[in-house]
């Protein structure tokens, strides 16, 4: 039962983590372009 709960947590966190990293990289890219880097 613990394995099912753990796999559910992992499956829920992975897309959120990937999305967060993508958004952070995108914002950093946008900010870098504004300063002409």
Swiss-Prot record:
Disulfide bonds: none annotated. The gene is petG. The chain crosses the membrane at residues 5-25. Belongs to the PetG family. It comes from Emiliania huxleyi. One of its GO terms (molecular function) is electron transporter, transferring electrons within cytochrome b6/f complex of photosystem II activity. Keywords: Chloroplast, Electron transport, Membrane, Photosynthesis, Plastid, Thylakoid, Transmembrane, Transmembrane helix, Transport. This is Cytochrome b6-f complex subunit 5. Its main location: plastid. HAMAP family: Cytb6_f_PetG.
């Amino acid at each position: 039962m613990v394995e099912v709960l753990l796999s559910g947590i992992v499956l829920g966190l992975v897309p959120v983590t990937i999305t967060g990293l993508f958004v952070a990289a995108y914002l950093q890219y946008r900010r870098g372009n504004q300063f002409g880097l």
